[in-house]
Amino acid sequence: SAWRVLLQPGAASPEHTLTSDEAFVALRGSAHVELEGEAHELTAGDCLVVAPRLRFSIRNDGREPFEAVCCMAAGGQAVVEGEGTFVPPWAA
């Protein structure tokens, strides 16, 4: 499945893991990514692939929206510690 993500300034995801690979291709803006506790910046033109079971979060610390195209296998799940597993609507 493929979808667009739009993170407004100040928006963030909770730390989570995935059951399958998830790929992000940044289209505009920038985002701060934490991957297994390591900080990365994702800017327009960058690609990031998050492997299964890696702790991951993304946030927009900038002044402009961050937009990306994401891909994940249909049926892939996200796991938030203490909250359980769910299938993101775009991966259903």
Question: PLM features: residue spans?
Answer:
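Conserved beta-strand segments that form the floor/walls of ligand-binding pockets within enzyme
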Residues: L6, V25, E34, V49, ...
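A short, compositionally biased micro-patch
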Residues: Q8, L18-T19, A26, A51, ...
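Short beta-strand His + acidic residue motifs that chelate non-heme Fe in jelly-roll/DSBH
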Residues: P14-E15, V33-E34, V50, F56-R63
